[in-house]
């Protein structure tokens, strides 16, 4: 089973996009993601949400 979770919330869709475009995130992901045996991401769905839905 899962032992850890990483969750982020953003004030707006543009805030989420800024995070996803970040060079720092890309560098972190390059080193971190290969160490995971199980991953679950829902970014595609989140990117399609209206900003009011992102603020729930």
Curated annotation (Swiss-Prot):
Alphabetized InterPro entries for the sequence: Dabb, Dimeric_a/b-barrel
Domain Stress-response A/B barrel span(s) in chain numbering: 1-44
Gene3D superfamilies for the chain: 3.30.70.100
Domain of life assignment: Eukaryota
Pfam family, one: Dabb
Name of the molecule in the record: Stable protein 1
């Amino acid at each position: 089973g899962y032992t850890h979770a990483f969750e982020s919330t953003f004030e707006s869709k543009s805030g989420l996009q800024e995070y996803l475009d970040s060079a720092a995130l890309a560098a972190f992901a390059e080193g971190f993601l290969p160490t995971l045996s199980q991953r679950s991401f829902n970014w595609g769905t989140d990117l399609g949400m209206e900003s009011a839905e992102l603020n729930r």
